[in-house]
């Protein structure tokens, strides 16, 4: 059993672990349990009913949070010529081609949150799969990060589009804001996330798709959400 900090144990006393909370109450409570000295991220954890043994049921895509995550997103773009210029003008932090591939390979450069590529770049960045893949940074058509529309993609990821995927236990973890967000913004982000995840239900999933949803802060305990009321929002 991992040892929890005194702060965590105090926060856990505020949460009734047998209760499923309505969203408004859960948001109030998650803020009370976020007692660290930094502005903690509020996270939504969704347990899905997918069978992870079946690759066709794996979920990978992007969702848009109306109020963003509260984190400054660093975007890297693999592009050349006019597309490279468009990416820079749209606000990309790093733009390049072979030079960036080399920087990642030889220097271990990973100071970015999202990597976008034009389709013609895939042949030169394919060898980065072993580095970027495990970190969830490899450009992919499924996540909208392999595209000719680089300027639009850069702007969307800067504004609040985030990539989501199921982990090896079929769970999805989504940052939905910061403790400093007002309650209404957190609520709107959470509802938007749930609705968009519902639309990603793979065709082969039988039974209930979203089995459980839990809200927590970076350092705080989990707060179980009342799914019936949440799905009606």
UniProtKB/Swiss-Prot annotation:
The keyword Cell division does not apply. GO terms for molecular function: rRNA binding; structural constituent of ribosome; tRNA binding. It comes from the Bacteria. GO terms for cellular component: large ribosomal subunit. InterPro entries: Ribosom_uL1_bac-type, Ribosomal_uL1, Ribosomal_uL1-like, Ribosomal_uL1/biogenesis, Ribosomal_uL1_3-a/b-sand, Ribosomal_uL1_CS. Keywords: Repressor, Ribonucleoprotein, Ribosomal protein, RNA-binding, rRNA-binding, Translation regulation, tRNA-binding. Gene3D superfamilies: 3.30.190.20, 3.40.50.790. One of its GO terms (biological process) is regulation of translation. The keyword Thylakoid does not apply. Binds directly to 23S rRNA. The L1 stalk is quite mobile in the ribosome, and is involved in E site tRNA release. Belongs to the universal ribosomal protein uL1 family. HAMAP family: Ribosomal_uL1_B. Part of the 50S ribosomal subunit. This is Large ribosomal subunit protein uL1.
């Amino acid at each position: 059993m991992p040892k929890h900090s005194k702060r965590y144990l105090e926060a856990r006393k505020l949460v009734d672990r047998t209760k499923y909370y309505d969203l408004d109450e859960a948001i109030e409570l998650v803020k009370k349990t976020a007692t660290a000295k930094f502005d903690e991220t509020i996270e939504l954890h969704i347990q899905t009913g997918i069978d992870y043994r079946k690759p066709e049921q794996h979920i990978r895509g992007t969702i848009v949070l109306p109020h963003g995550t509260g984190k400054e997103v660093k975007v890297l773009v693999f592009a050349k010529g006019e597309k490279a210029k468009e990416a820079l003008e749209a606000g990309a932090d790093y733009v390049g081609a072979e030079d960036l591939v080399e920087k990642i390979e030889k220097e271990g450069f990973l100071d970015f949150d999202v990597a976008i590529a034009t389709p013609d770049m895939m042949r030169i960045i394919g060898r980065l799969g072993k580095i970027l893949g495990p970190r969830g940074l490899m450009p992919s058509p499924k996540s909208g990060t392999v595209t000719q529309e680089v300027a639009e993609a850069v702007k969307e990821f800067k504004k609040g589009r985030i990539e989501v995927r199921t982990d090896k236990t079929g769970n999805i973890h989504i940052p939905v804001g910061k403790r400093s967000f007002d309650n209404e913004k957190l609520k709107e982000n959470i509802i938007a996330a749930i609705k968009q995840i519902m639309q990603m239900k793979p065709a082969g999933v039988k039974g209930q798709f979203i089995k459980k949803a839990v809200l927590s802060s970076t350092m705080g305990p989990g707060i179980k959400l009342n799914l019936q009321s949440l799905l009606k929002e």
